[in-house]
């Protein structure tokens, strides 16, 4: 789970660290830089998965950048199979059932770490399945344009 940097460290300078705060920073399954910071708190590396843990909880993205994680997101190490599985869980309403909060819905660390994903033992099989669903996602995106 992320940890927000001090507000005085936020910037508009792309040479600073990209700050991912939540759903607003995830577009079409990818981190879309919008805010920067000079302070590193918790980080995610290129290729990591990013999950929004605040409303709407469960929205997924990938990062093509090294980023700083704010409080509204969690960084997850995983491959395309894990990404596609988490996207499916979100579309099935899994995270919505676990979300709680008085001001806005959010999910906690236990909800994320205790989620059960059936993962094939064979990494090649994981990659094949993940890539297959990624291809379908790309095809759908193409037809929606």
What is the predicted role of each segment?
Residues 1-119:
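DNA target-recognition domains and sequence-specific DNA-contacting regions of bacterial/archaeal
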Residues 116-145:
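Amphipathic alpha-helical segments
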């Amino acid at each position: 789970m992320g940890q927000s940097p001090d507000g005085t460290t936020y910037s508009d300078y792309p040479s600073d660290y990209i700050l991912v705060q939540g759903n607003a920073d995830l577009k079409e399954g990818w981190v879309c830089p919008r805010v920067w910071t000079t302070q590193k708190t918790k980080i995610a590396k290129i290729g990591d998965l990013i999950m929004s843990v605040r409303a709407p909880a469960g929205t997924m993205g990938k990062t093509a950048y090294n980023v700083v994680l704010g409080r509204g997101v969690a960084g997850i190490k995983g491959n395309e199979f894990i990404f596609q599985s988490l996207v499916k869980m979100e579309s099935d309403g899994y995270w919505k059932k676990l979300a709680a909060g008085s001001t806005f819905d959010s999910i906690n660390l236990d909800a994320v770490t205790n989620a059960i994903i059936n993962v094939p033992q064979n990494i090649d099989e994981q990659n094949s399945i993940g890539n297959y669903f990624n291809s379908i996602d790309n095809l759908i995106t193409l037809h929606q344009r």
